[in-house]
From Swiss-Prot:
UniProtKB keywords: Ribonucleoprotein, Ribosomal protein
A Pfam family recorded for this sequence: Ribosomal_L12_N
Annotated protein name in UniProt: Large ribosomal subunit protein bL12
Gene Ontology CC, one term: cytosolic large ribosomal subunit
Cell wall biogenesis/degradation found in the keyword field: no
GO function term, MF aspect, one: structural constituent of ribosome
InterPro entries: Ribosomal_bL12, Ribosomal_bL12_C, Ribosomal_bL12_C/ClpS-like, Ribosomal_bL12_oligo, Ribosomal_bL12_oligo_N_sf
SUPFAM superfamilies membership: ClpS-like, Ribosomal protein L7/12, oligomerisation (N-terminal) domain
Length: 125
């Protein structure tokens, strides 16, 4: 039981960058996908019927591909969007990756516009 408590403390103590690396490891090595609510779920077998290709996507992930030359302004925008602390926002900007996940289309486009105005290169997935 002490090992589980230690593991829980270690997970809670992860920085945003470390949590992102853990998510990647769990996905790549073990096939565990993160659920929308932040919980972890196992990847199940493929469904028999595929979703229609014409369905419009309503939720997007806002991804930072390049911080550009004006990194300070990008860090400020990332902090404003995510509510992260200065160090966490700086680490995220330097490493790149998802700024926000499962965001409504209008909000995702607004975030993209703000980050691009700050000098970053952003993609919506």
């Amino acid at each position: 039981m002490a090992d589980l408590n230690k593991l829980a403390e270690d997970i809670v103590g992860l920085t945003l960058l470390e949590a992102q690396e853990l998510k990647t490891i769990l996905k790549d090595k073990y096939g565990i996908e993160p659920a929308a609510g932040g919980a972890v779920m196992m990847a199940g077998p493929a469904a028999g019927a595929a979703a229609p290709a014409e369905e419009e996507k309503t939720e997007f992930d806002v991804g930072l591909t390049d911080a550009g030359a004006n990194k300070i302004n990008v860090i400020k925008e990332v902090r404003a969007i995510t509510g992260l602390g200065l160090k966490e926002a700086k680490d995220l900007v330097e490493a790149g990756g998802k700024v926000k996940e499962a965001v409504a289309k209008a909000d995702a486009e607004a975030m993209k516009k703000k980050l691009e105005e700050a000098g970053a290169k952003v993609e919506l997935k």
